[in-house]
Each structure stands twice: as structure tokens, then as C-alpha cells.
Amino acid sequence: MDNISNHAFNYPVLVLNKGLLPEHDDIALARYLFSALALAVSRITQNEEMIVGFHLHPQEITRWKDDECIRQYILPLNIRFNSATPIAGFIREIMTWMTPDAIHQKNAMGASVLTLGPQHALHDIFDLEISWQPPVESEPVQALTCHVASREDALVLTLRFNPARFSATQMQKLPEVWRQITASAAKNGAETLRDIGLIDDAERQRVLHAFNQTEQAWDGETTVAARLKNRAQRHPEQTAVVFRDETLSYRQLYQQAGALAHYLNALETERERCVGLFVEPSLTLMTGVWGILLSGNAYLPLSPEYPEDRLAYMLENSQTRIIVTQPHLRERLLALAPPGIQVVTSDDVDAFMRQHAHSLPDAPQNDIAPHHLAYVIYTSGSTGKPKGVMIEHHSVLNQMNWLAQTVGLNQETVILQKTPMSFDAAQWEILSPACGCRVVMGEPGVYRNPEQLVDMLAEYRVTTLQCVPTLLQALLDTERLTHCPALRQIFSGGEALQKHLAQACLETLPDCELINLYGPTECTINNSAFRVDPVSVRQGPDTLSIGAPVANTRYYILDNCLTPVAVGQIGELYIGGDGVARGYLNRDDLTAERFIVDPFAPAGSGRRLYQTGDIASWNPDGTVQYAGRADNQVKLRGYRVELDEIRSAIETHEWVKAAAVIVRNDPFTGYQNLISFIELNAREAALMDQGNHGSHHQSKADKAQVMLQLANKGCREFPAASQPYTLDLPGKQPDEKQRLTAFSRKTYRFYDGGAVSREDILSLLHEPLLTAISRQPDALTLDELGHWLRYLGQFTSAERLLPKYTYASPGALYATQVFLELNGVAGLTAGHYYYQPVHHQLVRVSEQAAVTPGSLRLHFVGKKSAIEPIYKNNIREVLQMEMGHIIGMLDIILPDYGLGVALCDAAALDPTPLAIDLDDDYLGACDVLSGPRLPTDDDLDIYVQTAGANIADLPVGTYRYVRGDLQHIADDVIDKKHVIAINQAVYERSSFGISVASRTEGWAGYVHVGRKLQRLQMNPLNIGLMSSGYSSETGNDLPAARRFWQILGHRTGPYYFFIGGRISDEQKYSEGMREDAVHMKGPAEMIRDDLAAFMPDYMMPNKVLILDEMPLTANGKIDMKALANINVELKHKTIVAPRNPLEHQVMAIWQAKLKREEMSVDDNFFESGGNSLIAVSLINELNATLNASLPLQVLFQAPTVEKLAAWLSRARREPVSRLVQLQPKGRQAPIYCWPGLGGYCMNLRLLARQLGAERPFFGIQAHGINPDETPYATIGEMAARDIELIRQHQPHGPYTLWGYSFGARVAFETAWQLELAGEVVENLYLLAPGSPKLRDERVAAMNRKADFDNPGYLTILFSVFIGSITDPELERCLETVRDEESFVAFITGLNPALDDGLVRRITRIVAQTFEFTYTFSELQQRQLNAPVTIIKAQGDDYSFIENHGGFSAQPPTVLELMADHYSMLKAPGIDELTSVIQYQQSPPSLVG
């Protein structure tokens, strides 16, 4: 390999001297290069199988013309790689096989040729392509493409790669790995891929040796049996074991275990046999384990909870001949055990000891050696058959010694033995008497009962508890762990521990130590440990580290070639040391496969490693980060994906208690789909009808609630055959006031109107007295009656899917019906009438009327069938509150007619004339009377709460509203988690909450609190409210009510809670559905939306399914097999064809530019292979063809055919912001970044993408790029206008500002102006703020004059478009360009896709800004408080800022790159830039 350089597009270019290659004709060279490159790619990616597209050399096309596998002259191959195969031999085999005669034959490598159907997009399936065509920048690349050009003396190879599939680090390693492979092939030696190293010697020393300094010599006993004997001799009367009201001292434990050991030795003289232990949690379990150990045998736990088939297999496979059990389990054991098994109970032992006790010591004096077998644990096998893991005494002793010394197990420790004994993790609980601990034996099945578990922790004053994260979460959910004051240690293991769970645990138990443990059964219980620090965990990763290896344990993280990986790189974890098991019982084949010779140990040492199958990486501090299972690594959507990484990301969501991810093949298409199962955390994500909820409260994908809302199921239905008298009321068409009343009374979920003050809340709560001229109901005309009844009807709008009402209804189901009972009113016949709200009609249901002449009464009926499909609990409560909402609306409306309402005594009413269905509820009635009649609210207690700093003059806390003032009663408030999950985002946006409690018990109290909310909602103050919780008469109080009673210290009567904030006029007068989006999405959809904000698209689940409970295995882990059997209905990705002429026109241009035959109108431009050059060409073509004036940045706001066509079709064009969203995802505050000269943001896209999804990234396009824009005259004006733009998006700081090249000056000026305005700038990053040094002597002495006669200016202008000052075309530019016209012609000649208007506009921006600089005095006046980081490019001159001191209150951080001014924003230079930035931003403790 002669050299490595960079292509104009900055892809790696390799030049290979033909004379140094073993083959000399081009066809043989092509195969040689292909096989060597494929090996190199396999080595750096760890892929052991790849699909490769080999473009036939032009000279051999005719030889292949008849082969049916060839498509478009491409040979599609499936290549497998064996890291142990000699490199030279592999290359020879491939070259021999890749001929028309041999390609379809079997071969030693297992390679094959693929037959592709027409449905396969040819280029999309390849991991690697070898092409003889030159690279074309506009063509998308799916993975890695090598373009080969043959010269007389050399081959020139240009590598184009997809950064989403190959990291820049991998591409930087590729040439060197390729060089090593070709060198090995040339020597024709025996080297394999395992001999090709990827890390240097220093890193190798670090990960192999420095991180494995765990040697520890233990003094004293050599077995745990000897440790127990020693303990019994030194502390005979100390309590060792407790079960219910029974106890064993150490002396008793040793004696009873010794008695069993004597009896076992009498039955069986051979040692190291498996003795089964078939017992329930009890003292017998403890004496059984120790008795078997003292007998010199190995115990085999046989849990009575296990299926009989599993137990039978374990007995057969282990060849067990003796089983210890309890008397009451004897018959059950005999029924499942094979013939010849000897069953031992305490009765047998007691009988034996009565005969021999006088002649026997406390325990047999067996010579138990460290290498003897201690126990056998059966663990699940991949074949479905469990496998027995053999653990020796020295391994157990090492574990117990480490627990005693490092974790602190001693005589003060009280352990709850609750883990089922058949699991590896239970063994240290059972064997802990060897450390002097007291063991409390848990009740059978206690590990499945969190409430009972907490009771035992408290009763027995347990100090140390072990549990899987799933159980830990369940214990926290009891909210009773604080009742366990003795608890000082919690060990978590068995599953990945998430940060939010660790934080919740330590916040609940601040004096308790939390230790994360890890270890496969094959390596003796716990192999690594991580003590969770309450402070640093907040800044740590979402999934906690599994820690560092324990004493006498070695961790190796290796790639697929069994070579160590660098810190931070992913590999498979191999474990060595004292904990490694002997192997699998009677499974020599599997033992040889999983227990390998330690390649890092001296030859002949006998040391072995266990291959865990777990994926992990080293942290800089020597701890290990677990990343999932190797068998959970799948190739999905072209990407290699860790299912555990996706699960871990989902579990960081605060609503998620547990998650699991599986891949399922679509039965229709055969494609793989990613399915995520989620169990919600009920404490953080409460559901309506919690515990009795339907699936629609978890997901609204089926739109069941919306369909009910549209069906008007709350209306009364009459049989067609007996249709009663129906009157069409006047006033069906609402007037403007009625529409305004209906649409301004919303359940507001957004608060865009600004801050709320204490005075605003007092004004809201102080309802003015209503004054109006009183009238009697009999004075109403039919027109007036129709007019005010219209307020009870439906309102519709072209902007809404759902109908609108003037009053609130739970679930917007409007299940409360209104009936009028009238006598002598509006000329109508006396009787009862149903008001039909959809058609604005009165339907007579009875000609009876109990009211006196001239009277009007309203009756309310709840139609339960309209609400029961959605709500299961509190149906009567919400219907009564809806009745209150209607009456509250009438309180506001009727005074305009001289009327008011008063509640009737429900007990005195007869609903018989209404002829309601038996299943419906009669709710009550109110009389319409003369004059305004607002209730006094004397029986209501009103409270206000504020949270956060939302109200400046009202500190956080809960207040009681008393006589027009607010009195502070508590600092505590109803928190976000106390409102149902789908409303929590509204809570975060709100400014305050109001609680209303009625002193009137029963249903009348619910009417009153509902009436109060409705009147408050209809306020004229632009304050919006949303109901967020209520009490229950039927025992189903919502969390907000329970929390409020905690704050008060007692329960109230009927209770209602709502939150609110200030709304804008636009919200108030809107007839749209923005506030009603909650009906469209449930927790499943909202979680998926949240995941999309920080998870790459290829990792997004196709389906998120919420389960009431995760299925669990017996040891508390998620049962993946049970999940795989759950039926999941999948939505299929369909191609949406253009639906109108405009979409057809846009699609045609789109397909032509992206070179795609099949596309959907919802396909994303950038995800479909679009880049900057294609974007320019596409927009130019659209503008020319459609006579439009689309700005370039429109593709960021409308990146699909569908959205772009909709944008074009709007009569009024929405202005496209110069704030260009380059990376929208992230939970942190955004980054605002200015591009270089010319002001076009497209070259910042790769930077935005490489930084990841932690925070959004916005580029700020220069004013002047779009047509009809004029560049700003000064930097000061540019910054001022850009600040206006930024503040529209983020009103207040702290701000993060970046600037590249010339953009660094604008970023600096913007930071200064923001600080001048009192804002905080958190960070200012200046990327390559200096100009590139111009090496040509004609331009080296450049000046700042923007003139085409100035070679320096022309060079920089050229670089704006070409991205280089060394391109060969620069010389021609300097020679031929004399003015703007000739420059525009020159650039568009080089790149015809560029529109001359765009080139001209960018040129003028460069001309305007080229001369911008600060004077000395201007810089002297500008001193920033913000921390400044300067990242210098290789070869740049000093920047404007480095020549001046004092521009920053604190010294700036200056970092230098190897990449130059232009390559730092391209691959692979971008990798160096982002690495430097991420290193700089890392917390000091994590930087190693």
C-alpha cells in the first residue's frame, strides 16, 4: 500500500502498487482485493457473515451473462468468516470459487451465491460492495462501497461508507487492518484474523492486567464446612437460623447437620456424589445443605415448585441416588423419582442417631479438599434441557470470604433467605452462617409477595436483602420500606439495574447501601460488584455498571477473534479465576464449548475462561458496563442491534417499571419486527380505573374512545316504530356568542399565555355577584327557550374531528342526558321532554308533569352504557360531576334570561315519567327559577397549590382559600405522579392546582364540586383549567385525592382537583383540537413518542404493548418465552402512493433525484439517501417545474413528499424559519450553531448527527440565502436578529452557542449581546475560528478586501462552494474568474445542480461578511462570563479572538485537532471533532 489520502468528498482513498500485489491481471486482482477487503471489514466490525455485492469486471461480463444470479452485472454473495482460518488460505479459496464454473458448488468457507427476487432493492441488502465505477456523491450508500480504478501501475480504491453503519473510528482502522491482511497473504503464512490486533500495547496492558489486579490470599479454613465448624466451636449459642418461631443456634445447626452427614455416610461410602435436597423453606433446608456438605458430597437443590418433568430430568442426568426431603413431601417425591432412589427424612436420621449417637462425634471427620464438589445447580439450557453446573469448595469459599471481607457479612448481619434454593443466587444466603450471619428463612413463595416480604423485613429486623430489580421496584411500590429501619444493605442482581430505580431506592432508604451484583451460575454466584454512590449516580449512565471483578477473578472483554477490545468498545465477557466452575455435569461436549483454555495464561497453567455470552465494555475506571446478551444481538433494518440496549433505553422512561424486547417475523412479509413489552410503574404512571383498567387506558391505537365520542352514544335512542312527538327547536344554527362560549370553554392542556400571579388566582376564586332583571320561567318564549337550550347542544367546526360542548364531560363521552319537565312554559304541552343535543330537538316522553303551572325543572339521567366501555370505576361519580358541570354552565348562561337554577331534593323526586332504562342512573334535578341563583359555596373548602417557581409571588406549597386570601398550610403538594399518566405533561406545563372539597357527603357533594369547576372554567381572565383527579364513593379514589388527604392529614367529603395556567387569546378563540389530543394517544403511544425523541429510528419498536404484569420465571426474571407466545397484531409498512396531481408531480422529481423506483409519500428525504447536493438540485427542479419559490431549508420542515406538497398547496405560505432543525431529538436544552462563510447550514448536518440524540441541534442560516432577502450590514445586526429568532424558540437561557469558522464571530457577538441583556450563556464553542492558511504565495499576503482581484478573497470564496483550498480546480478559478458573473458561471459549471441564483446570493453574503472583524476597542469592550472553548483546526491562522486578551472572565479552553479547517466537518475528521467535544463535556470523574 503506497499511501492513503482523501477524495474530494473526503472519503478514504487507498493507492496500491500493482507490483507489490501477488496477482497481476485485473480480474484476479479484483478477486484478491475483494477477499482481502471482506476479511478486513469482518475484522473491524466483528461480523462473521456478510452479504457482498461484487460488480463484475468489464472484461469478464460475457463469461457470466448466462448466470441467473447476476443482476445489473452484480454478483450477490453470502460470505462466512472463521477467525481461525488462515488468511492466505481463505483468499485462495475465494479466488478459486468466484468463477462461473465453481460459484454454485459447495466450498470450505461455507460461502454461497444468492438468488434475489424482484422485491429486493439490490443495493439496500449489501454490507459491502466492490465497484469498478467512480464514486458519485449524489448516490446514497447503504453500507460500505469500494470503488476501484485501475491505473497502469496501481489500483486506486475509494471507500464510501454510511456513518450510521460504520463509525469513523472503524474506517480509520480499516486501511491498517487491510495492510496487515494483504501482508499476511503475501507471506502465505498461517496467520489468522485472530493475529490481527486492533489495540496498541498500552491499551492491551491496561485491559488485560491493570483492570484485573484482584489477587487475594485467604487465611484459615479451606472449605465452608470447616468455617461452619469453627463458628460452632467459637460461638455455639449464637442464633444461626430462624424460621417462624423456631431457631437453631450454631451448635444445634452443626449437630443436626452432622447427624444427617453421619447417616448419609452410612448409606453411601463413595464421596463427591450428588445428594438431592427436596425441601420447602424451613430449618430442614438449612440442616440439609450443611449436612450434605459435611458428608463430603455435593448438594443438588430440587425445588418442590419445579415442574415434575424438570425434576425428573435433573435426577436422571445427575444420576442422583439419595434425596433428603421432609416427611410431608415423601410420597410426592417417591411418585416422581425414578426407581432405586433412596429417600431420607428427619425420621430416618433420628432413628439412626438413637442407635449410634453415643459413638459418633458431632460431625464426620471427612477429608474434604478445596477441589471437591460442593453443589450442583441446574440452569436453563439453550436446547430446552437444563444443565448442571458443578461448583467446587474452593470457589464457594472464595465467594464467602469476599462477602465477609468486602461486603461486611458478619455476626451483626441478619439475612432474609427468600430466593428459591434452586437458583445460584440463593447459595450465599444459605451458606452465610459460615460468615457468622443470622439467617431468617422466608415463608414459602414470599419472594412473590412484596407486602409479606416487607412484613418479614420489619418483624425480624433484617439488615441485608438480596433481590432482582423487578422485586426491588415492587418493594418500593408498597411505600412501606421505610418501616424497615434495620435494613442497611440491598443487593441487586439477576437483571440490569436502571438509574431511576437506584435513585428511588436510595431516596427512600438514604441510610441503606445499594450494591449491584453480577455473576453467571458457571462462575459461582457474584463475580463483580458496584457500590452505588447516591451523588455520582445522577450523572452516570442510565444502566448502572456491574462493577469491577471480585477477589481472585479476572474479566476479559474480547472480540469475535478472542482478542481484547479497548476501553469503551463492545465485546463478549469471558471470566477467569477461582470462581470458574468445574463444568457441566455429564456434559463434556458443552463444557468444552463454553469453558475454554485461557489464551492469556502461561502454557500448561490449566487456567480456563468461561464464555458468558454477555456483551459488555470497560469503563475508564476499570468497572464494566453490561450491554446485553450476545444471543440478543440481531441484524435489523440493516443495522446490528442489541435488544438489551433497546430494553435498557426504554426502562429509563419514568413510567416504565419493566420492559422486554423481542424480534418477531411478520407472517405476511417475512420481515423482522421489533416488539416492546412494557409494564407500567403504577406509582409514576397511574391509569384511569387503575387495577380494573381496560386496554384503551394503556393504548389508544384502536381509537375506541374516539369512535364512541363520534357515535353520540350518550344520546337517548327511540325505537323507529314508536317515535314520540319531536319538536325542532328554533335557534339550531348557533350565533357568534354561543360559539364563542362553547369553544372558549375547553379542558386546557397547554398554557401559552405567560405567567400567573397570586392576584390572578384570587381574582379567579372571587366570583362576582350576578345582577340581572328577574323573570319567571313562564315568561319564556319558544325562541328564548330554544336559544338557551342551544348551549346544551353540540357544536361542530371544520377544524375539529370531535364535537364540542359548552361543559366538560369525563372522557368527552357526554353520557348525561337532560330532560325538561315543564308546565305552562313557552306554549308547550305540559309533560317531560328529552333534549336531543345533536339535532336541537325536544322529544316528549311523557304528558305528565308534577311541577306547578308556570314551572320548569331539569332532570339528569346518566346513560351508563355510553361510558362503561371506557370507564370501569367511579361511573356514578363522574356522571354526578357532569351534572354539576351542566348546572355550572347554566349558572353563567341563564342570568342573561333573568333566570337561575337551584338543586332539588333528590329524595322527593319521581323519575318514573322519564321511562329510563333499568341500567341507567337517575342523577337528580334542578329547578329553573327567577333571577340569578349562584350557590353560596359555604359547604366547599377550596385550596390552591403551586409547584416549582411558576408563580413568583406565591412560594411552593399548599394554601387554603379563606375570605378572599390564601393561607399557607403545607409545603407538600400533589405531585406530577399523582395525576394520571396521560395528563402528566399537562401538569408540568401548568402553573397551579386547585382542590375543591365538599362538606356535603354523598352524590350531592359531587354535583357541587363539578358545578364549581365549570364556573371557574368559564372565567373571563384567560385562565385555563383541566380536571386531574377526584375522590370516590365506591372505594376507587384517584391518586390526587389520596395524596391531598395525606397533606391535610384527614379525608374530606367529595373532592375534585384541577390544574391550570394562563392561556393565550389564540387558544381561547381556537376551534381546533390541539387541547383534545389526549383522546388520540394513550401511555403506549406517548412512551413511543418520548422514545423517538432520543432513540435512533432503526432502534424504534414497531409496536409498544403495555401489559398489566410482566410474566416472570420462578427466580423473578422476565419470562421471555411467555412473551414470545403473546399474540401481537402488527401494522405493516405500506407504500402510500400520491393522492393528488401535486403529490404526483413532487414524487416524480423526488424519485428522479433520489434514484428510487418505489417510494411512499411519507418517506423521509434524508433517510432515503438525500444529501446537500441532492437537496439543492431537488429544490431547484421543484421551483422551476412548479413555478414555486421554495427556500432550501424547507426540506428540514417538510422532508416528505406529502408534507412538501401540502406546503406548496397552502394559499398563504408559512415563513420557513432560518432556525434550521438539524437534529430534533434530545431532552436537554438545544445547541444553536452558526455555519461558516456563506451562512448555509447543510455542512453542519453530519456534526449534528454525530453528536447523538442527547440534545437538539439547530443551525442558523444567514439572512440573504433565500430570494428577496438582504444580508445584514454588521455582525452586531446579524447577532441581534438571530437572538430574536432564538428567543422565539427558547425564551430564556441558559443558552449553548456554537460557531464554525466565520460563524464563530457571530456566536461570540450573540453571546455578548445575550449576557448584556441579563441572560446566561452556559457554553460558547468556537470551532475553527481562524482562517485556513493560504500557502500559495500569490494569496499568502491576503487582505480583508472582498474583491475578485484579491486572490485571498477568491480562494476563500471558492472554498465555500468546494470545501477545499487545495482542490486542483482552484488554480483555474484564480486564472479565469474576474467578477461575480464569471465566478457564478465557474461554480455552476463545476456543479450543474447548483442554481446560479443561489450561488449569487451566497457569494453576496460572503462579500458582505468577509471584511467583518472587530477593532481593538470593540474587543476590549466585550468580556464574556460564559466558559469559552476554542477548537483549532490543523493549519489555521490565529483567530480574531486569540490575538486579544481579556475577552473572557475565565481562561478559555483551547483544543487542537489533527483535522484541517474543511475536513473537520466531514468523515473521518468529524469523528475526531465529536470525540474532542464529548471528552471536553464529560464529567471529570469519568474522564480517564
Swiss-Prot record:
Coiled coil: none annotated. The modification O-(pantetheine 4'-phosphoryl)serine is found at S1172. Its EC number is 4.3.3.9. Disulfide bonds: none annotated. Residues 1230-1346 are annotated as: Thioesterase. One of its GO terms (molecular function) is phosphopantetheine binding. SMART domains: PKS_PP. Keywords: Lyase, Phosphopantetheine, Phosphoprotein. Its cofactor is pantetheine 4'-phosphate. InterPro entries: AA_adenyl_dom (IPR010071), AB_hydrolase_fold (IPR029058), ACP-like_sf (IPR036736), AMP-bd_C_sf (IPR045851), AMP-binding_CS (IPR020845), AMP-dep_synth/lig_dom (IPR000873), Nitroreductase-like (IPR000415), PKS_PP-bd (IPR020806). SUPFAM superfamilies: Acetyl-CoA synthetase-like, ACP-like, alpha/beta-Hydrolases, CoA-dependent acyltransferases. Induction: The basal level of expression is very low and is probably responsible for the absence of indigoidine production in the wild-type strain. Expression is strongly repressed by the HTH-type transcriptional regulator PecS. Weakly induced under oxidative stress. Expression is 10-fold induced during infection of Saintpaulia plants. Belongs to the ATP-dependent AMP-binding enzyme family. This is Indigoidine synthase. It comes from Dickeya dadantii (strain 3937).
